[in-house]
Amino acid sequence: MPGNKTILYASTHLGGDKCPETGDLRRGGKYLWPIFNTYDIFVADLNGKIVKQLTNAPGYDAEATVSPDGKKIVFTSDRTGDLELWTMDIDGRNQKQITFGLGYDGGAFFSPDSKQLVFRSSRPKTPEEIQEYKQLLSEGLVAPTNMEIYTCDVDGKNLNQITHLGKANWAPFFHPSGKKILFSSNHESKSGFNFQLYMINVDGTGLVQITDQSVFNAFPMFSPDGKKLIFSSNRNNGGTHDTNLF
């Protein structure tokens, strides 16, 4: 958060003392994500003390990030019946829905100039895909197996699909120049479990592969000067399920 004295995060703690039940997260060979309707967005100080609750609408409010200029927050909410992107002022006021297409819009980040957003979306198209998406969502689930990278202005205008790779393309993040996007994808993985990092121009050209180890690589973020990036990977974990930062 602005000033580096508080942290923005989502939590289900108002829904009960115990973690929400996840149930079976595999169905028909697909991996599923739970969408807990007890998630809300909070601000806490560096000691963990909650100083403000920003959302209190029924349903899922999570995946919040702050604009570089410190004025806006983008987040995902299903309060209108679908998983859409919303924005709000840094103090939680003026909450506004900015995407309206059927599908799971989430994982959004602002561009360095705070004027655009990059996010991943499932956007089902065929009748079968639409039916499956709606059925899973009614159960508080999504199948993150077919997602592409999109950009739009902070008001939702000028929506553009950046990738057309198939499979799961997600965890996008802008390069500090604002001209490239870093993301994770399994589109070249036969098993679907190996994710590599890629970079692409904001117009969808110039796809470049960044990592090459046949493991899980995701959640990349650039340093402010663009010279370094940090990401999560399960490489070098000795055969365990550990995921570490690199």
Language-model regions, residue ranges each:
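Tandem repeat domain/solenoid detector
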Residues: 72, 89, 153, 179-180
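Residue-level detector of Asp-centered blade-edge/turn motifs that repeat once per structural unit
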Residues: 2-3, 68-69, 112-113, 176-177, ...
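A structural signal for the main folded, soluble domain(s) of proteins
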Residues: 109, 208-211
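Blade-loop segments of beta-propeller domains
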Residues: 1-2, 14
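Short loop/turn segments that connect beta-strands within beta-propeller blades
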Residues: 45-49, 89-93, 153-157, 201-205
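A flexible loop/linker signature enriched in serine peptidases of the S9 family
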Residues: 10-40, 53-61, 76-86, 99-104, ...
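Hydrophobic beta-strand positions that form the internal "hydrophobic ladder"
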Residues: 7, 73-74, 117, 181, ...
